[in-house]
Amino acid sequence: PEPFKQVYYYYPHGKNASRNYTQSNADKDDMDRQFIEKNACRYFYNFESCRDKLQYLFANEPDPTGTIDSIISYLMDYGHPFGPSVTTWEEFFKALNSVTIPGSTTLQGTNIQLASWKKFARIMRKFQSEDLFVDKGHEITDKSDLALDLFDNMTPNDVKVIDIAQLDPFMQGFVFGDVIQQVVERMSAKDKNTPDKIVIFVDELNKYASTDVPKSSPILRHLLDVAERGRALGIILFSVEQFRSAIHERVKGNCANSAYGRT
């Protein structure tokens, strides 16, 4: 056996210079070598690349009335004051603040209740200082659209490693949701540049497809799609979790192979 030869690493953008401006606990010498050999880059999310992905931050947030979903749709439709001129995170949060003022004309124009906007804003503000949400990277080679870059120049036997280990659990889910959506979309509409098969390795699948995950979760929806149509699409999901019983029944029911053991 020998190491894979065609491996490319994606490290989450960070502010720590001693860690190559990443949020990673990978070996520093390994990272240095990978960057020098151009086998690695940092990834980040500017607002423009993130507008249609915010739903993944709310994947585990119960939304029985669909209010959060309505707000996200409003943002994706460039509703006022989140029009095309809002292109940075600073502009987004400024616009968000304007709709959380009771009685404001901006709020009234959205036709969405103040309480719903406040709930959405409260959750979004937790990520206002997130190092992954920046308008530009540390270097010009940093990637602002991870999911799209994964498919650029993809060749057979490529291995793409996306480091999310040190990220907040919400951010881990966000990145995973972004990637799994792109994989499903690409494999559902194959062209000559699309690989025949893609194998996805993910640890702790129970974070995204457990019996406790809200039914409205977009990540769960993608995973159920993979579990039920993966063979036809050419997507193979390989996952590890501590308790199989905690995994969604439709995921377990479509599992082709299982391995059990103790640690």
Residue ranges and their predicted role:
Residues 1-225, 232:
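P-loop NTPase motor domains
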Residues 218-263:
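Conserved ATP-driven motor cores of ASCE-family P-loop NTPases powering translocation/secretion/packaging/pilus
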